[in-house]
From Swiss-Prot:
PROSITE patterns: COA_CT_CTER. It is found in: Cytoplasm. HAMAP family: AcetylCoA_CT_alpha (MF_00823). It comes from the Bacteria. Its EC number is 2.1.3.15. InterPro entries: Acetyl_CoA_COase_a_su, ClpP/crotonase-like_dom_sf, COA_CT_C. Residues 33-280 form the CoA carboxyltransferase C-terminal domain. Acetyl-CoA carboxylase is a heterohexamer composed of biotin carboxyl carrier protein (AccB), biotin carboxylase (AccC) and two subunits each of ACCase subunit alpha (AccA) and ACCase subunit beta (AccD). GO terms for molecular function: acetyl-CoA carboxylase activity; ATP binding; carboxyl- or carbamoyltransferase activity. Component of the acetyl coenzyme A carboxylase (ACC) complex. First, biotin carboxylase catalyzes the carboxylation of biotin on its carrier protein (BCCP) and then the CO(2) group is transferred by the carboxyltransferase to acetyl-CoA to form malonyl-CoA. This is Acetyl-coenzyme A carboxylase carboxyl transferase subunit alpha.
Amino acid sequence: MSNKDQTNLLNNLKDIAQKAGLDISEELAKINAKLESSTALSKTWERVELARHSDRPRTLDYINLIFDNFTELHGDRFFGDDPAMIGGIGFIDGMPVTVIGTQKGRNLRETIDRNGGMANPEGYRKAMRLAKQAEKFKRPIITFIDTQGAYPGLGAEERGIGEAIAFNLREFSRLKTPIICIIIGEGGSGGALGIGVGDKIYMLENAIFSVISPEGCASILLRDSSRAKDAAAMLKITSQEVLDLKVINGIIPEPEKGAHTDPKKTADAIKEQILKDLADLTKRDPAVLVKYRSKKIRSIGKYSE
């Protein structure tokens, strides 16, 4: 039953009660509260589904739409190359920048090749290598985040996935060059944070950002994996909720029915925001950038009664 049908049914019930001289205001208030809760759950889950939509533009799509002459660079110089993590150099309105991002697949073959966008330690070490290179040559860094999380496999653990992410968190906060991070789909846990420390952090309107997936939270905390929708609402993962928590700097709008309906329009909105921030950040002293970036990151999650 749609929200409109539910509203009409309640209005009819209210009219019948009034004609019969009955006071059902208390019961109606309880029903309305349940409907509002149900609507909130539905809206949150709609965002989750849009963030995971199979046709949603990926990192490479935005790279091709926003940057000129992109040249991909490979390898972490420790173990190997990770196809789940894209990195390279491109130009935006003539300005050279380093672009880094997690890459999901579009079909089964690509998803397998890209490991579903879940990077291994070598992916995060490659990202760090390119970030250090960007600092050396005074290039701004743009990161695109779209991942369920870092890969949780045995090999990843053996090669130090936790250390790789922790190292990135520390080093990205110290880089003396502008960093802009954009969550374009799923921003999952430490996998997102590994390339998510920046001077400016944005989410696309229908992206999500969370410490754990709704399914994982439902299984662990609620002891019922079928309650993923409830968990999603509890986690406060939508762009507006994350903005309200002051974790991000802003929301980049999408077409009404999602980024996949008009990738070019979405890319144009992202490009506009990047150029606006670069015009400001590139004028700042590198030491000042680091100072305010560190302060920003340390203030996330700060709470006082």
